[in-house]
């Protein structure tokens, strides 16, 4: 009976996320943009803006082109993550060595000691990044389509398939919006890269599993209570499986919380996305997927039970 409330809450949260996607955009990783990324440790705390200002002159082409460079703190003020597309279109080890030399020169101009080689370094060619991006989003699209088909066939009703599909889209948009709103705000990386696609696919898989459990119970109750109104049957079925769904979600979230606080910095963004994605996936499997399904099935209300005729 609270479907409109849940629709409003979900619509508001998703709307804020979409607004952020349009206005702020995303922190695209080199997997999707192409470029080089380095994690450099310094002897003393440094400002990200100061590091970027020192690198911009050295990452300028001979034709005057200013290549894109971004610098973000990575686990504290003594460690920076540097990303640049400087000479990324030119292949060869000589180019790689030149970029390393230019980077060291720019960092040396800061006057602060730093460790070299970099703690982490990675290079992704533009053609490879385009291919990665296409395959990544295609995998998400196919996952959504196949989940819709699976649910529709399993429960012999397209209404269930639509409910499951829209709840998965809801979870995906929520996670995208979260990354858009919080990148640059939290103290760890929230890049849109291959790891993020793994987050989305994991959330989709977890959410659809929860949804199947709820829909199975609904189907069972629909079979046993054929004379009851559809909304009443849905409410009874959801209430009967509510504790199981919440307990399962709580145990999963507890494990992720422990990994987040005690795991390394490099996986914090991944675990962060999983935590909130699974949290909203648990919510949507109960309050979004079933709400949409019941609205689509309301035209199947049972006919009134005829009263027996007495002589």
Feature names for model-found ranges:
Residues 1-311:
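A structural signal for conserved, well-ordered secondary-structure elements
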């Amino acid at each position: 009976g609270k479907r409109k409330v849940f629709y409003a809450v979900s619509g508001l949260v998703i709307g804020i996320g979409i607004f952020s996607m349009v206005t702020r955009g995303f922190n695209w990783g080199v997997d999707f943009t192409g470029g080089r990324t380095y994690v450099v440790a310094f002897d003393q705390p440094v400002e990200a803006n100061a590091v970027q200002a020192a690198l911009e002159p050295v990452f300028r082409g001979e034709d005057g082109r200013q290549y894109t460079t971004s610098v973000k703190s990575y686990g504290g003020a003594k460690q920076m993550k540097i990303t640049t597309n400087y000479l990324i279109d030119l292949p060869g080890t000589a180019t790689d060595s030149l970029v390393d030399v230019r980077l060291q020169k720019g960092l040396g101009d800061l006057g602060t000691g730093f460790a070299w080689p970099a703690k982490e370094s990675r290079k992704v060619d533009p053609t490879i990044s385009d291919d990665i991006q296409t395959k990544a989003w295609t995998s998400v699209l196919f996952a959504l389509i196949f989940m819709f088909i699976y649910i529709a066939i399993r429960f012999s009703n397209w209404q269930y398939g639509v409910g499951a599909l829209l709840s998965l889209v809801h979870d995906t948009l929520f996670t995208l919006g979260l990354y858009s709103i919080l990148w640059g705000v939290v103290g760890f990386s929230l890049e849109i890269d291959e790891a993020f696609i793994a987050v989305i696919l994991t959330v989709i898989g977890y959410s659809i599993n929860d949804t199947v459990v709820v829909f199975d119970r609904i189907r069972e109750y629909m079979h046993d209570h054929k004379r009851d109104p559809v909304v009443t049957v849905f409410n009874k079925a959801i209430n009967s499986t509510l504790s199981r769904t919440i307990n399962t979600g709580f145990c999963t979230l507890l494990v992720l919380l422990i990994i987040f606080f005690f795991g390394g910095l490099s996986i914090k963004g991944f675990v962060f996305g999983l935590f909130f994605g699974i949290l909203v996936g648990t919510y949507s499997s109960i309050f979004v997927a079933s709400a949409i399904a019941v609205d689509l099935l309301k035209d199947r209300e049972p006919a009134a039970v005829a009263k027996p005729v007495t002589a």
